[in-house]
Amino acid sequence: MAIAKRKPAEPVRIELKKEDTVKVLTGRDKGKEGRVLAVNRETGKVLVEHVMMIKRHTRPNPGKQIKGGIAERESPINASNVLIVCPGCHKAVRIAHHIDKIAGGKARRTRVCRKCGQTLDRK
């Protein structure tokens, strides 16, 4: 019997961007806020500053100038477990999208807070 090949997973649509401030909704770090350091759309995970800290044991390698010991670093968390924090109302909110007309007949999609309506995108 032949084994069926698994299809590659489709990239997840994540509304978060690097440098966004987010609040963790579930898990051992529930309630913590932090900046997004990286977004991985293939796995649907985000790396949040000072959230899901893990200890990494490394061996010393003098040839590569690596000092051994126990290093703490962030571990990725599922993007569905965080919400963006609105700079206007200072709450974890869902995101809406508005389409703004710009010069030349083009349109720009901006992220907007659903509660207060403030734009979440940086200029």
From Swiss-Prot:
GO terms for cellular component: ribonucleoprotein complex; ribosome. One of its GO terms (molecular function) is structural constituent of ribosome. It comes from the Bacteria. One of its GO terms (biological process) is translation. The keyword Phosphoprotein does not apply. Gene3D superfamilies: 2.30.30.30. InterPro entries: KOW, Rib_uL2_dom2, Ribosomal_uL24, Ribosomal_uL24_CS, Ribosomal_uL24_KOW, Translation_prot_SH3-like_sf. The keyword Ribosomal protein applies. Keywords: Ribonucleoprotein, Ribosomal protein, RNA-binding, rRNA-binding. SUPFAM superfamilies: Translation proteins SH3-like domain. PANTHER family: MITOCHONDRIAL RIBOSOMAL PROTEIN L24. Belongs to the universal ribosomal protein uL24 family. Part of the 50S ribosomal subunit. One of two assembly initiator proteins, it binds directly to the 5'-end of the 23S rRNA, where it nucleates assembly of the 50S subunit. One of the proteins that surrounds the polypeptide exit tunnel on the outside of the subunit. This is Large ribosomal subunit protein uL24. It comes from Solibacter usitatus (strain Ellin6076).
